[in-house]
Amino acid sequence: MTDSADVSVSSPVDPPARNVPWLRVGSWVVFAVVVVMLPQQLASAEVNRLSEVMYVAVAALGLALLTGYNGQISLGHGAFLGLGAYVTMILTVDYGTSYAVAGLVAVIAAFVLGVVVGLPALRITGIYLALVTLALATLFPQIAIRFGDITGGSVGRGLLPRDGYGDSALIEEIGRRRFLRTQGFRAPDWTGLADDQWRYYVFLVIAVLVFLLVRNLVNSRVGRGLVAIRDNETAAEVAGVEVSRYKVVTFGLSASLAAIGGWMFAVLNNAVSPTSFTIALSITLLVAAVLGGAGSIIGPIIGSLIIVGVREVVPEDSQRYTQVIFGAVLILVMIVAPGGIMGVYRQLKGRLARARATRRAPSATT
């Protein structure tokens, strides 16, 4: 009787279930087509806004990996993003390096700094770790101002080489390479694309690669180890997880992803300044991750869309209030819906599934 009931319960669900994979694939195909075609249909300002969503999402994904999957709280990821942006501007403008090389150096530098900052995580957790990273976010703009000869000080850096850079012979040596860098991130002639469209597609490729990297990582044995550490560090260590190495390397990897977001920031804005990388940016990234759902991969992308969208609709003279709004939203979400939007979605999905199963149960038993 029980076996037949089990069969009869599952059989009504089977026909639509067979269509789900095709529906899912079709949805992703439509989504991909829309994403690829958007730059052709939108104005330049709107394309740049979508590019902003992508660099915020990349940095928020790195933060979600650290906070949502590994349980380490960081209020300093704005500093890692700023490091990536400054390294990119300095290397490309002053030394004529390619954007690719500058990005690689930025990622390595952020990884090293992330590992150094992550070392205290071996001893402290929770609010105390958050305070350590908060100190980093607070210090970063001051450090940028202090080393003004390199960073441009409180004014920041743009596409022009820093004042007094080198003599005429050195400028001639760098020559054409540096001149090209001072033109910004331009679309190659063979693409036939406007600069904003080319930038969008490059950002899209980077965002997709980062998304796939994080997805594969969290679904691997390493990802299961990260979650085990988050849930119970002692039990994870007993189970054979190398807790110290996992925590430090995760911090470094998370910082590297934020630095990629910083590279994208520099490419998009063609300028950096200390005021762009204050504690407010770190809070914004944390809100993007937590609001969408730091324990999911899609969540930070949703959160980034909302964050950038809110900035877009808030009047220019009221932008200073957005950080207050984001802070309030962060507190509210952590109290009411710790899993963020994706957490609420999963709960509703589970309730609907249980409700459907309950409705089918009486007919199945008859």
What are these regions (language model features)?
Residues 2-366:
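Transmembrane alpha-helices and adjacent helix-loop boundaries
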